Amino acid sequence: MAWSRLMLAACLLVMPSNVMADCLSLCSLCAVRIQDGPRPINPLICSLECQDLVPPSEEWETCRGFSSFLTLTVSGLRGKDDLEDEVALEEGISAHAKLLEPVLKELEKSRLLTSVPEEKFRGLSSSFGNGKESELAGADRMNDEAAQGRTVHFNEEDLRKQAKRYGGFLRKYPKRSSEMARDEDGGQDGDQVGHEDLYKRYGGFLRRIRPKLKWDNQKRYGGFLRRQFKVVTRSQENPNTYSEDLDV
């Protein structure tokens, strides 16, 4: 018995490490799974039979059948998981498609509109009758007239507001027709036109300017006393009045 154990240990040492590890793991898994069954297996003997060091027996056959069943169940479970994942993906895709369906329809419509050639649109425009074109032209004219009326009304209101603001100054202020006349005449009669412009501009102020007064105190008083108080100088008095006073 001791010699058999020593030989088993020597065989285990001589075996490749990866094969030994695979066989040991498989046999240990089988032993753990079947230990509560009617025929438990020895993992050491199972691993030797797995590595072809010992002739195969019932233990290795049992473990191999269990391993094949285990692989089938694992693959079946994986297949079910894959099917469930595929179903979930399909459901998610269908839900997204339902949500994006109106957006996709609008995009298709826009693509169709852009893909239609310009000649078709020209044909559609030519399908309108002359009556419709005349109606459109009449409507445009009415809009233009209404816009012009609004501008005229607006200008009149502005003028009224300005007249109220400046107290009639704009009505009294003359137009500068003299500048236009100068441009037309080429600069001729410039003094006369300028005098008329000044005369209209100052509103009769130039008419109140009087000529020089010829009396004695004109240089001294500048005509102020004569205009305001009607003062009569001695040079204008009658000298006979003084002689009569002296005679009396």
Swiss-Prot record:
Keyword presence, Cell membrane: no
Basic and acidic residues composition bias: residue spans: 176-185
* Disulfide bond keyword on record: yes
Q: Which residues form the propeptide?
A: 22-163, 177-199
Q: Name one GO biological process term.
A: chemical synaptic transmission
Q: List where in the cell it is found.
A: Secreted
Pfam families linked: Opiods_neuropep
Name assigned to this protein = Proenkephalin-B
User: Per the UniProt entry, what species is this protein from, by scientific name?
Assistant: Mus musculus (Mouse)
Gene for this protein?
A: Pdyn
